[in-house]
Structure formats: structure tokens, C-alpha cells
């Protein structure tokens, strides 16, 4: 890696995360946090927030089905959680329809669907080719919408859909143009879902910097070093990062609250790291 960061030592949590994931709190039984027995499909469950959420949901008594591209990782996790694993590329509409229908048939319906999949290509905007743009939109924006479309006929009364977005929408960083633009498109698509289906609680969660994800997996380290320097100059390096298991449990609580209070929905939620917080 080129030495371009002499004044800004690299925080390796930001680059590589923390692969350890704490179990969720299985003792939660209050009506506002209870998800026991909920039939839940978690898309993007092979790593990061999706994986942590699946683990926490299982610990809190939910029945989970897991979907992601990396079926080898998914199968191991599903076995641990007594759930089912489904290979899924969310840029493939037919695959989405097949997986959602299969899970709904196994469960007899869906109480919650969670979408955490994301494509995050790191490249300067002039180096981002059309194929990359189209794939990123297909995963992050169109894929999420098609999941909702496929799930709609199978959603039980008072079912909830939760979709992970990014707190960087409207404040883009250098080197992540396709990701930021696709997440902005996702936000507008979800607004349209709420406008056309006000009966369906669609919770859009803007998630800030989080430890324990694989957002930088496969990225060019030399490019990241240069980008890190630019982000530092622009004040875009987070002083703190949220723990992935805390984010996961917060997301599950949003689902529980929406199901416990059917006349309201947390339409837009922002999750940001708490500065100076200490893990208990």
C-alpha cells in the first residue's frame, strides 16, 4: 500500500471491520420488542448487518430464512440457526421471485422481510464504467424494489418490510459515486412504495458507519488509501462506528414496534454512531 497517509493513520476497523458478532439479547419479551414466532426473510444474510440481524432474530425467537449470493457461508449459518438457506443474486428478477415464493410456501406467509444486500464498487467517477453503474443500480435500487414486488402477495396482515439505505445519501464521498447514486434512487423508490401502498409498513433505515461489515471486501487497497486521505481532508472519517450487533438489534426493534403498533410506521429512520458511547 502506498504511504500517503502519514498525517492520518488508518483505522483498520474502518477498512476491515470486526468479524466478531455478539448474540442478540434473547430475554426481550416486552410487546414493543417481541418478535417471537415472526416468519422473517433476511436478504443479504451471509455477512455484516444481515448476518448479525439473522443471528439476533433467531435469538429473539423469530423463524428465519436466509438469502444471499454466497451459499457456502449461508448454509453454515442457516444450520446454526435452524433456518433455511437460499442462494440469491438480487440483480436477477427470476431468482428473486423463486426464492420469495419458496420461503413464503415454507412458512405459510411472511411477517417481515429485511433487505440488506448492497453492491459497493470503489472507483473514481471517471473510471466507473456503464456495466458497473447498471449492476449497482440493479442490486441496490431495482433489486430491493423487486423483492418488495415479489413479497407483496405473501405478506401477512401487519407484515413489515425493512430496507437498509445509507446515511451518505445527499453527502457523497469521493470514489463511491455509483453506490451513493443508487442509494438515492432506492430512497425515491421506497417513497413511491409508501405512496402507492400506504397499508404496507415500509421502513427505510439510513445506516451510518458500522463496524463488522464487509463493505470494503475486494476493493483496491491502493485506491482506498488515496480515498481515505481525501475523506480525512473533507472530515468524512467517522470518529466512532456503530457495532454491527447494535445496528441489527435496532432494526429488529423497528420491526417489533411497527407490528405492535399497526396504526403507525417508522417511515424513515436514521442510525448514526453515538459519539463517546461505550459497549456494555
Identify the meaning behind each predicted range:
Residues 124-125, 132-134:
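Substrate-binding pocket helix/loop in short-chain dehydrogenase/reductase
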Amino acid at each position: 500500500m502506498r504511504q500517503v497517509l502519514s498525517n492520518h493513520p488508518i483505522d483498520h476497523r474502518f477498512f476491515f471491520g470486526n468479524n466478531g458478532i455478539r448474540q442478540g439479547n434473547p430475554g426481550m419479551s416486552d410487546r414493543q420488542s417481541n418478535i417471537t414466532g415472526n416468519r422473517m426473510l433476511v436478504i443479504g444474510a451471509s455477512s455484516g448487518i444481515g448476518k448479525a440481524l439473522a443471528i439476533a432474530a433467531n435469538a429473539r425467537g423469530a423463524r428465519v430464512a436466509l438469502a444471499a449470493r454466497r451459499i457456502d457461508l449461508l448454509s453454515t449459518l442457516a444450520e446454526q440457526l435452524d433456518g433455511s438457506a437460499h442462494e440469491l443474486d438480487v440483480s436477477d428478477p427470476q431468482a428473486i421471485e423463486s426464492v420469495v415464493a419458496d420461503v413464503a410456501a415454507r412458512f405459510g406467509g411472511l411477517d417481515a422481510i429485511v433487505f440488506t444486500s448492497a453492491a459497493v464498487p470503489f472507483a473514481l467517477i471517471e473510471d466507473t464504467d456503464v456495466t458497473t453503474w447498471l449492476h449497482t443500480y440493479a442490486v441496490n435500487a431495482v433489486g430491493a424494489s423487486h423483492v418488495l414486488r415479489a413479497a407483496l402477495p405473501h405478506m401477512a396482515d401487519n407484515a413489515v418490510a425493512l430496507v437498509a439505505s445509507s446515511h451518505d445519501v445527499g453527502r457523497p464521498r469521493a470514489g463511491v459515486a455509483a453506490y451513493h447514486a443508487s442509494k438515492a434512487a432506492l430512497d425515491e423508490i421506497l417513497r413511491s412504495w409508501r405512496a402507492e401502498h400506504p397499508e404496507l409498513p415500509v421502513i427505510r433505515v439510513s445506516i451510518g458507519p458500522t463496524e463488522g461489515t464487509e463493505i470494503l471486501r475486494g476493493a483496491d487497497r491502493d485506491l482506498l488509501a488515496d480515498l481515505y486521505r481525501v475523506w480525512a481532508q473533507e472530515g468524512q472519517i467517522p470518529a466512532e462506528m456503530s457495532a454491527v450487533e447494535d445496528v441489527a438489534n435496532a432494526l429488529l426493534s423497528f420491526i417489533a414496534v411497527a407490528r405492535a403498533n399497526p396504526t403507525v410506521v417508522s417511515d424513515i429512520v436514521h442510525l448514526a454512531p453515538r459519539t463517546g458511547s461505550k459497549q456494555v
